[in-house]
A protein has these predicted regions:
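Bacterial N-terminal signal peptides
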Residues: 22-40
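Active-site-surrounding "flap" and adjacent substrate/cofactor-binding loops of secreted or lumenal enzymes
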Residues: 118-133
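Short, solvent-exposed mixed-charge patches
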Residues: 395-397
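An alpha-helical repeat/solenoid feature that recognizes helix-turn-helix modules
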Residues: 46-72, 90-116, 134-176, 183-231, ...
């Protein structure tokens, strides 16, 4: 029996809530199949399987042709995120970077303005933690398991930080388990198969660092004699001494630095933020493809496919990169009133789709475009959170 099958999908946001009615997800009427709107080299929704589908949950394919929403709706975005994460967690029974891993990490961050994270999320993370704790140590350092453990620890740390402001024993267990999966060089193993979120050991190391950064009291309370203290230092030294493979990785490093500046991972913080302004498109958004050369995203034939895209496709602003940058800059205490950030937020406000998603074309295949999920999580965080108290003053462009 599926562990969530008897639980209704609900939230507390009024008319747009998710609720199972007569065996059909009420939100599904928003997630309709879109007809072809022109030729751009992409498959159309009618040619694609649903993006998420499990029992009563059905979310149709993400496409570039999906109509824009008449106005920005945090309710629609939250509904899409909730349904997608539930469907993946119930169906796949695992942590994925692109869906429930991103949801677990980001969802608690906007709990103040959009309500608390659902209880099922923590229950799912706890079941995953217990399952991984039963594995032999060698099984924790294989395939993408180290990355999954990093997202698990980050999700629990985020929950504690934004819901309770204290570290739970479960988060302590998850962080310690995560470090059991650490590689000798301080990184965390990951196959370079599904960029950008599953692209390298470096990317996984930044997620692990973010997990610790979201629980600052935990790391500060580590005794020097605790073996984990040496492992944490190894992680910090890896990120300090290993050149970031591309600008995308540097954005994540900046995100870690926003929460744990004491580590000194980004020496010229303001210079790097200025570089982000320089990469901003004229419409106010950013393009993920502008943050790494095609060959830098991983092995396989991906580079050839990316190079075959038109210049317009490569340079087009997308929800993933724009949402990520706007969210990270707000975590860096850049004010909403900063002209360049304001342009980015305005792009997000005007580019949501009718389903509640933000569009972003996958770097990998033109089938599921799961990158739209993290795009929506980052975009909603950027639009829903208030900036942190300033610790660095950023100049106007």
């Amino acid at each position: 029996m599926n562990r969530y099958a008897s639980k209704p999908l609900r939230n507390s946001y009024g008319a747009g809530c998710l609720e199972l009615r007569a065996g059909v997800l009420w939100l599904v009427f928003l997630l309709t199949t879109y007809l072809p709107g022109g030729s751009n080299g992409l498959l159309h929704a009618g040619e694609l399987p649903p993006q998420y589908a499990f029992e009563e949950i059905l979310i149709h394919a993400a496409t570039a042709e999906e109509p824009f929403a008449a106005e920005y709706s945090s309710e629609a975005a939250l509904g899409y995120l909730e349904a997608g994460a539930r469907a993946w967690s119930q169906d796949k029974q695992c942590i994925s970077c692109h869906t429930n891993g991103s949801y677990a990490l980001v969802r608690p961050m906007f709990s103040t303005n959009l309500g608390p994270s659902p209880d099922w999320l923590r229950a799912f993370l706890m079941e995953e933690l217990e399952a991984y704790e039963d594995k032999q140590p060698e099984g924790l350092r294989k395939d993408i398991v180290p990355t999954q453990l990093a997202y698990l620890a980050a999700g629990l740390a985020s929950w504690d930080r934004f819901h309770h402001q204290t570290i739970s024993t479960e988060t302590d267990r998850a962080l310690r388990l995560m470090f059991k999966a650490q590689s000798e060089d301080g990184s965390f193993l990951n196959e370079d198969c599904w960029p950008p979120l599953e692209s390298s050991h470096y990317q996984s190391a930044t997620v692990a660092a973010l997990a610790v950064a979201l629980a600052p009291a935990w790391s500060k309370d580590l005794m020097p004699s605790d073996p984990v203290a040496a492992k944490l230092d190894r992680l910090i030294q890896f990120l300090k001494n290993t050149p970031a493979p591309h600008d995308y990785a540097r954005v994540w490093l900046l995100w870690v630095d926003a929460w744990m500046p004491e580590w000194g991972l980004v020496e010229a913080n303001q210079d790097w933020v200025q570089h982000l302004w320089d990469l901003q498109n004229s419409d106010g958004g950013w393009s993920m493809r502008s943050f790494a050369d095609p060959e830098k995203w991983g092995d396989g034939s991906r580079a050839d496919r990316l190079r075959s895209e038109t210049t317009r496709q490569r340079q087009a602003s997308d929800g993933h990169m724009t949402g990520l940058i706007c969210m990270v800059l707000k975590h860096c205490a850049v004010s909403d009133s900063h002209p360049s950030l304001r342009r980015g937020l305005s792009w997000l406000e005007t580019h949501q789709r009718e389903s509640g998603r933000w569009w972003a074309r996958s770097l990998n295949t033109d089938r599921y475009h799961f990158i739209t999920y993290s795009a929506t999580a980052f975009a909603l965080a950027a639009l829903s959170e208030t900036p942190r108290n300033k610790r660095v003053q950023f100049s106007e462009p």
